[in-house]
Amino acid sequence: MSRVAKNPVKLPSGVEVKLVGQQLSVKGAKGTLELIIHSSVEIVEEAGELRFAARNGDQQTRAMAGTTRALVNNMVQGVSQGFERKLQLVGVGYKAQAKGTVLNLALGFSHPVDYELPNGITAETPSQTDILIRGIDKQLVGQVAAEIRDFRRPEPYKGKGVRYADEVVRRKEAKKK
């Protein structure tokens, strides 16, 4: 059984939470995020904390309470600190350049790849082979990073491709005669 929902979510200073019906709104220094809460989950705000409880004790409801707690915790962290994901380009001639809401990638194809960034996401290129994806929505930051990585995944023989900065690519040995 998950015990995630038993831990309260602490609200840092500057973060405001508003619950209207089943709509939860979290507002902070970096922006506002909204979430529709499942009807089987009950949320109580007390003393700068949010507490989560299942309305009845069955397994699915308890699981939903834990999931809701994790999502709200990510929202609170996002509007106060934000999230970032770092990508690296490994390969000869692989380059990235951020131009406003478009990320221009040269990944060894016969054409450049232009990736349109969704609202709420910013991309920085500190160097030609590093990409920093930033935003307040953890799911969206991870989704954008995964979509960029999917253009050219790291291959196991030379390790060329787009990889997460903390990713370890398993290498294979070349075929021997």
Swiss-Prot record:
Listed GO MF terms: rRNA binding; structural constituent of ribosome
Swiss-Prot/TrEMBL keywords: Ribonucleoprotein, Ribosomal protein, RNA-binding, rRNA-binding
A single GO cellular-component term on record: cytosolic large ribosomal subunit
GO terms for biological process, alphabetical: cytoplasmic translation
Subunit structure: Part of the 50S ribosomal subunit.
Role this protein plays: This protein binds to the 23S rRNA, and is important in its secondary structure. It is located near the subunit interface in the base of the L7/L12 stalk, and near the tRNA binding site of the peptidyltransferase center.
Family: Belongs to the universal ribosomal protein uL6 family.
The protein's name in its UniProt record: Large ribosomal subunit protein uL6
Source species: Pseudomonas syringae pv. tomato (strain ATCC BAA-871 / DC3000)
Name of the encoding gene: rplF
